[in-house]
Amino acid sequence: MSLQQVSMADLQRLAEASADVLDQVRDAMMAPHPLKTAPTFTSVSIAELCGIDKSQVKYLTQKHNLPAGRKIEGSKAKEYTLEDAMTWVKALGTYPARPEGKPGKVISVCNYKGGVAKTSTAVALAQALTLRGLKVLMIDCDGQGTATQLCGISPEREVDVEQTLMPFIHGDQPDLQYAVQPTYWHNLSVIPASSGLLAAEFALPAKAMRQRGFKFWEVLKDGIEPLRTQFDVIVIDTSPSLSHLTVNAMIAADGLVMPCPPDALDFASSVQFWGIFSELVESLPDAKLKCYDFVTIIYTKVRGNDIARLVKTWMKQAYGTHVNGIEIPESTAAQMASAQIKTIYDLSKPDGSVEAYRRYKEPLDRLADYVLDQLALAWDALPKTASAQSGLFDAAVVQA
């Protein structure tokens, strides 16, 4: 065996070739459509979404002049578009809505470690909230751009750095409205990311050194502020690290969601994450006064073995009521959706085992319901003229 030497030019060619392969894979997954398309719904799924019996669909269609769906060729069944489904939800008032005059809420999905289903959970949560009648903005704060990819946009092929957070971070834009893009999913917009966003980890500390009094941790909060009147919920996907942008996302948030597998190393990493964040907050002026409407930790990639059960008891002891008991299983349904650059909500019908599909989707539905309940409580607690700022929360509480 001879020594294999790899030059920087070789790595450049490797990067270009791998990017080409990824584009080909993405195009193949989207075929025959060049762009990602929204799912369709059956009468049964419309009924489930609205919390009614299927037998009521025909009656309510006529009574409220709701979308009747279209006949599927060669079948008696009907299918409904995503927009049809949202019209039904809004018309029947199935879920709580943002009260008039109150600001939209920001939720950051965070973890110190990769491979914990953080991004897929964040995008699925954003989609599920739209299915509950809310207008949602997804902000991708990870230079890898996986959330952007799941929103139907190729981060390297279709996103220029000027379309990311970077112009605002550099001070070239007054807020983040310039970066908001529509997606294939009705009522879901995105501020995309690409590898150019990695420059934020140099730009923010450099700006802090140049400008006395510059609060690098509040940049994202300031940029989001005007968007709170335009969106009911803003979901932020963070990088798997406690980077400058992740700190910004956590300071900007009203609620935090941490996906964490019940695995010893993942649990240890989560403890380290909260410890470092709490120490950092203590060193930042005003940040220690930060308050969250909720902080919740959910089990992800759960296996039904003794080790997982043991680690779940550790997590409950460590985090107490912040662990809400939702368990998203390790599932072939998730793997099959991911292989198509999709979330479970992108599928019009189960791709494979119906039972695996339901086992995976049900806890994600419960997560969306839990988050929406927390948002409703937070909105109710706000006076109508309240600012969009959070109240008081000691970050160290999550270490209890």
Residue ranges and their predicted role:
Residues M1-L49, K54-A400:
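P-loop NTP-binding core
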